[in-house]
């Protein structure tokens, strides 16, 4: 059994998700102590508990410690990952429901199912666009297209928007099984082709997304960027608003967003998202801070070595690297000065 210190590094949910994915893929049993010890509320929250049970379900695994607030977990995978049709609902594990991010559940089970024999269809319910988590828009426009370059074939379709704190969102995920992962060489991003933006509001007046879109378009065009904005007013179970920007370079993709909240103007929401994008643009890096740690796992499982340059070497990145190396999957080197991540696959 592989023992993993959940308090290591940034001490968040990434340690848990990566460990679950690799345990399901390799069949290695794991024991995690100090789960999310670095967070204000340690232990398993609704989205983490859903990810734990989802990982166990797809490989008929056994669990101990799978409860809300638990800081200790044992996971013994069963007889390999089984492709199929699954439904995972974050709101079911917590009385009164939850807007926990379904994208975190998605990222936990995606690679195990992509490497399994047979195709899978998964319905995920909960929060689709939640602060401090990848949004479904980011998954659709950045994460999955980048993984496609490495051999992962998956698609997501948004069925219903789910904002904090109500949730109520739904996503359908289709995963092609039997994928063969290849390496990624991404040291230069090339010229910026365009920025695509989506400003959306549910159960709110139409002027809110339009104002976000107008402000973002003005800011980005003033900065000399080519931009195309779309403003949408959608139906939803609760009010919510946000703006989501995707920058397409010749060799890479990146995405940033901002969320509406009380006493924050639509224009300010757009300014927050644009500020993040422009700050990244100035770094010249191909890979944003968040995608940097998300690419580590597929790179470690690939048949070839990988290297990519990042905007920032975060503790999420170095923590994820340490967890992956616990499973003996190649060697990960992070050059802090050059901001280059190199993954030497053990399959080469």
Curated annotation (Swiss-Prot):
EC number(s) on file: 6.5.1.4
Main localization (coarse): cytoplasm
Active site: 316 (tele-amp-histidine intermediate)
Gene Ontology CC entries for this record: cytoplasm
Residues that bind ATP: 107, 290-294
Gene3D superfamilies per UniProt: RNA 3'-terminal phosphate cyclase domain (3.65.10.20), RNA 3'-terminal phosphate cyclase, insert domain (3.30.360.20)
InterPro entries in the cross-refs: RNA3'-term_phos_cycl_insert, RNA3'_phos_cyclase_dom, RNA3'_phos_cyclase_dom_sf, RNA3'_term_phos_cyc, RNA3'_term_phos_cyc_type_1, RNA3'P_cycl/enolpyr_Trfase_a/b, RPTC_insert
Catalytic activity: a 3'-end 3'-phospho-ribonucleotide-RNA + ATP = a 3'-end 2',3'-cyclophospho-ribonucleotide-RNA + AMP + diphosphate
GO molecular function: ATP binding; RNA-3'-phosphate cyclase activity
Alphabetically ordered keywords of this record: ATP-binding, Cytoplasm, Ligase, Nucleotide-binding
Signal peptide: none
Subcellular location: Cytoplasm
Example of a GO biological process term: RNA processing
PANTHER family recorded: RNA 3' TERMINAL PHOSPHATE CYCLASE, RNA 3'-TERMINAL PHOSPHATE CYCLASE
Family: Belongs to the RNA 3'-terminal cyclase family. Type 1 subfamily.
Function: Catalyzes the conversion of 3'-phosphate to a 2',3'-cyclic phosphodiester at the end of RNA. The mechanism of action of the enzyme occurs in 3 steps: (A) adenylation of the enzyme by ATP; (B) transfer of adenylate to an RNA-N3'P to produce RNA-N3'PP5'A; (C) and attack of the adjacent 2'-hydroxyl on the 3'-phosphorus in the diester linkage to produce the cyclic end product. The biological role of this enzyme is unknown but it is likely to function in some aspects of cellular RNA processing.
Alphabetical list of NCBIfam families matching this protein: PRK04204.1-2 (NF003246), RNA_3prim_cycl (TIGR03399)
The protein's name in its UniProt record: RNA 3'-terminal phosphate cyclase
Organism this protein belongs to: Trichormus variabilis (strain ATCC 29413 / PCC 7937) (Anabaena variabilis)
Lineage, uppermost ranks: Bacteria, Bacillati, Cyanobacteriota, Cyanophyceae, Nostocales
Gene: rtcA
